[in-house]
Amino acid sequence: MADLSLYRNIGIFAHVDAGKTTTTERILKLTGKIHRLGEVHDGASTMDFMEQEAERGITIQSAATTCFWKGHRFNVIDTPGHVDFTVEVYRSLKVLDGGIGVFCGSGGVEPQSETNWRYANESEVSRLIFVNKLDRMGADFFRVVEQVKKVLGANPLVMTLPIGREDEFVGVVDVLTRQAYVWDDSGLPENFEVKEVPADMVDQVEEYREMMIETAVEQDDELMMAYMEGEEPTVEQIKACIRKGTRDLAFFPTFCGSAFKNKGMQLVLDAVVDYLPSPTEVEPQPLTDPATGEPTGEVATVSVDAPLKALAFKIMDDRFGALTFVRIYSGKIKKGDTILNSATGKTERIGRMVEMHANDRNEVESAQASDIIAIVGMKNVQTGHTLCDPKHECTLEPMIFPTPVISIAVKPKDKNGSEKMGIAIGKMVAEDPSFQVETDEDSGETILKGMGELHLDIKVDILKRTYGVELEVGAPQVAYRETITKAVEDSYTHKKQSGGSGQFGKIDYRIRPGEQNSGFTFKSTVVGGNVPKEFWPAVEKGFKSMMDTGTLAGFPVLDVEVELFDGGFHAVDSSAIAFEIAAKGAFRQSIPKAAPQLLEPIMKVDVFTPEDHVGDVIGDLNRRRGMIKDQEMGLTGVRVKADVPLSEMFGYIGSLRTMTSGRGQFSMEFSHYAPCPNNVAEQVIAEVKERNAKK
């Protein structure tokens, strides 16, 4: 069995243009995995293997790859940097032990970098920082280091310093060993010499070395005391301190280079080995109670000898068939084994298992704790399901995905395309839990729901190219909600007595606004037997079933509290179904009396703009009914944070590019629901009525 201390499960994440995929390519080249390098700007990168990715030059799906460096096994996951795909970042962070945050030497810390960094902090993932593209015009390593401190609130520990700036960037100095690595102009990673530190950098290197040692020895009291008394620790002692501090998120070892020009990458790979944790050094995954979702107090110990515990973290359908990507936390698995899916209660036999290299695969006979593999042809597995030993059932902490906020109606151009579309969408929903589908009962239209415009654009594109389904696409629709603002006390009787056994159910109830995010809550305070206890669940079920369709415009209803306090029943004619029907009628009768209100999704918007355009950007956000929350002066421009209704954000990227001459960037994520202004609510309700009239 492989030694788990030699494993590194790492992710590479960053903003869209920071050079993340190129960095991954270089890692694969240096570790001997690929021979010709694929450049993203040629659309030929190894990791970006979907047509949509190659064309748009952005990474959409985290592709997993196994490679080796200095006797260590790296499982590398390349994650997307675009905000509409943060679900992929979140999903991959769940199965990583460490990461490399890539920042552009000229762009610095971009809005998306901050979102990904926050996710990584929440997941407590240890990271290295790689400041890339130092050969670019305007690149400044030290400015980016300052941004990491200010914008991310992180503590970068500078490990290498750049030799030369912009097009004169030739290499890096390793601050710890005081050695200079200088590359020639061939672009080949192996063509470098190790030299003495350039004379004009000696003082700077010593200054950064002293800062590094002072920060590192804080991890070891004895070493710190010795250092304060003038005794310098050895390189190995310093490395041990850096390793501990990195693991505890006290700081982030920071490197520089140019992935595209192949300069500085070897030191980053060495740092993955030296400083990022092995699977046995991170907090083990908690086990949860499947009924409540609460932690049981037990964990999935990272050990080959423990019973199997694995998490299916990604489903993909490619030209080879269905692939289930699995991170094994405990135990081992081999071809022919029968495993239990604790979410469905069903067992499956393991057929083929493969190690993935972007779009290629190597078959394996067995895998063990800490491996990331893909299993071919699993039937009933979805993202977030736990796979375990049938004799030792368990459930790993599940993945929670954000709720979609935007939808489009689609139908196949070809009448015979419906079945084909249904099968294709079914596969896509299994692959991406933040992408949902439903059928409009009245119109029969298929409604696709997602995290943003780009997210849905790409889904439509995949349907067209991968599955050959041409679609007619409707305008994007916002996921509005309804709620009530006033308490109502009311009574409703359902009576149907026309010979034979009839139906009778009378309920007296109060409906009032619930706490925010409470959904639907029900309680019964009936005293005596006016509504027998066995009918209470039917009353609750009746009310709850009506929450999907509000009375204003048919949108789902949020945050309503119902109290059943009295009623009446008939010894012969009363039944659970009679009380359920009574509750449904009561909902329709009383919600309009409770001052219903339309709610709209509010997005947390983060805009980066050059300083000379900030007035235009803020004016535009105000026109979009935005609330400006914060403004921060950066070194390269201004960051504006605002809460803006989603309905006002369609096509925003085009407007922002026009306003800022193509230099502005933004990210947005769902924040909360808030009441619509009356004029907006009236317009939305009128549009819904008009649409319904046409059906």
Curated annotation (Swiss-Prot):
GO biological process: ribosome disassembly
SUPFAM superfamilies linked: EF-G C-terminal domain-like, P-loop containing nucleoside triphosphate hydrolases, Ribosomal protein S5 domain 2-like, Translation proteins
Pfam families per the UniProt record, alphabetical: EFG_C, EFG_III, EFG_IV, GTP_EFTU, GTP_EFTU_D2
Alphabetized GO MF terms: GTP binding; GTPase activity; guanosine tetraphosphate binding; translation elongation factor activity
Protein name: Elongation factor G 2
GN (gene name): fusA2
Predominant subcellular localization, coarse grouping: cytoplasm
Domain tr-type G: 5-280
InterPro entries registered for this protein in UniProt: EFG_II, EFG_III, EFG_III/V, EFG_IV, EFG_V, EFG_V-like, EFTu-like_2, G_TR_CS
Family the UniProt entry places it in: Belongs to the TRAFAC class translation factor GTPase superfamily. Classic translation factor GTPase family. EF-G/EF-2 subfamily.
Annotated residues for binding of GTP: 14-21, 78-82, 132-135
Organism: Vibrio cholerae serotype O1 (strain ATCC 39315 / El Tor Inaba N16961)
Nucleotide-binding is among the record's keywords: yes
Domain of life: Bacteria
